[in-house]
């Protein structure tokens, strides 16, 4: 039986909409709230605070089907020394290559995985290890096209399908929890982890260190993406890293750990 994760990769999110960094509530574009006027500057702040990686979503691209915020993404990648993963509107091999050529480490596809499995397989074969699948679900059912369309496909079924097609990993977002700070959907995550042989990163609803510690207890979970929790001040990135990241509090000898008190 798998053991609880030794640590989680804590990944700040930057969601791009019309050139700004925003947060949505349950995926609702009408409820977009600006969290930073300058996304590049915000990315640099997260990197300075110790982020091991950055998660960037092109919300305009997710709706339109074509990456819209490429100049901003290119600027973020150029100025950061940490790896950047990008999703939103990547529905062709050409677009995936374009992002990787900019220096993006991982490309995250969602709609393609549901609507064009053959294209997903072509992408994973052409770009091995670089294509991750974003599985976004409402009550366990997969949503696509920037969360604007819900399908009858079960998230667990899609996990099994994409790992057979060569995906490198999965980012699972519970749309009903997204932006709520109400806590992650642990039961759904357990179901995802039970069928996945791939690394899984959780997103949606994380609002406290207690939530992060609950995620840490899930066997096989690789990481957690934080958005609103960081921007609202509910969690600070340094304390999240100390709580569940590599070298977390529990891994320190008592005399060293006391320095963080």
From Swiss-Prot:
One cellular component (GO) term of this entry: cytoplasm
InterPro entries in UniProt: Aldolase_TIM, His_biosynth, HisA_bact_arch, Isoase_HisA-like, Isoase_HisA-like_bact, RibuloseP-bd_barrel
Pfam families: His_biosynth (PF00977)
Principal location: cytoplasm
Associated pathway: Amino-acid biosynthesis; L-histidine biosynthesis; L-histidine from 5-phospho-alpha-D-ribose 1-diphosphate: step 4/9
Compartment(s) of residence: Cytoplasm
The entry's keywords: Amino-acid biosynthesis, Cytoplasm, Histidine biosynthesis, Isomerase
SUPFAM superfamilies registered for this protein in UniProt: Ribulose-phoshate binding barrel
EC code: 5.3.1.16
Gene3D superfamilies for the chain: Aldolase class I (3.20.20.70)
Entry annotated with the keyword Cytoplasm: yes
Gene Ontology molecular function: any one: 1-(5-phosphoribosyl)-5-[(5-phosphoribosylamino)methylideneamino]imidazole-4-carboxamide isomerase activity
GO process annotations (BP): L-histidine biosynthetic process; L-tryptophan biosynthetic process
Keyword Transmembrane helix included in the entry's annotation: no
Highest taxon of source: Bacteria
Catalytic reaction(s) noted: 1-(5-phospho-beta-D-ribosyl)-5-[(5-phospho-beta-D-ribosylamino)methylideneamino]imidazole-4-carboxamide = 5-[(5-phospho-1-deoxy-D-ribulos-1-ylimino)methylamino]-1-(5-phospho-beta-D-ribosyl)imidazole-4-carboxamide
Catalytic residues (UniProt): 15, 136
PANTHER family membership: 1-(5-PHOSPHORIBOSYL)-5-[(5-PHOSPHORIBOSYLAMINO)METHYLIDENEAMINO] IMIDAZOLE-4-CARBOXAMIDE ISOMERASE
Family per similarity comment: Belongs to the HisA/HisF family.
Name listed for the protein in its UniProt record: 1-(5-phosphoribosyl)-5-[(5-phosphoribosylamino)methylideneamino] imidazole-4-carboxamide isomerase
């Amino acid at each position: 039986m798998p053991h609880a994760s030794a640590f989680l990769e804590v990944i700040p999110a930057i969601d791009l909409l019309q050139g700004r960094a925003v947060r949505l509530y349950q995926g609702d574009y009408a409820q977009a709230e600006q969290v930073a006027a300058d996304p590049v500057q915000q990315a640099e702040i997260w990197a300075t605070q110790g982020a091991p990686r950055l998660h960037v979503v092109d919300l305009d691209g997710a709706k339109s089907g074509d990456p819209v915020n490429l100049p901003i993404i290119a600027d973020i990648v150029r100025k950061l020394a940490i790896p950047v993963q990008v999703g939103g509107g990547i529905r062709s091999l050409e677009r995936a290559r374009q992002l990787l050529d900019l220096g993006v480490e991982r490309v995250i596809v969602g709609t393609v995985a549901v609507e064009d499995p053959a294209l997903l397989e072509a992408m994973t074969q052409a770009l091995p290890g670089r294509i991750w699948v974003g599985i976004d679900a409402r009550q366990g059912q997969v949503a696509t096209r920037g969360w604007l369309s819900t399908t009858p496909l079960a998230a667990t079924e899609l996990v099994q399908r994409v790992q057979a097609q060569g995906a490198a990993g999965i980012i699972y977002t519970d749309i009903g929890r997204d932006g709520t700070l109400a806590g992650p959907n642990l039961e759904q995550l357990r179901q995802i982890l039970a069928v996945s042989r791939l690394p899984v990163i959780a997103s949606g609803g994380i609002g406290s260190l207690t939530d992060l510690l609950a995620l840490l207890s899930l066997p096989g979970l690789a990481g957690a993406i934080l958005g609103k929790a960081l921007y609202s001040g509910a969690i600070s990135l340094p304390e999240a890293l100390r709580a569940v990241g590599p070298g977390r509090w529990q891994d320190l000898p008592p005399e060293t750990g006391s320095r963080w008190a």
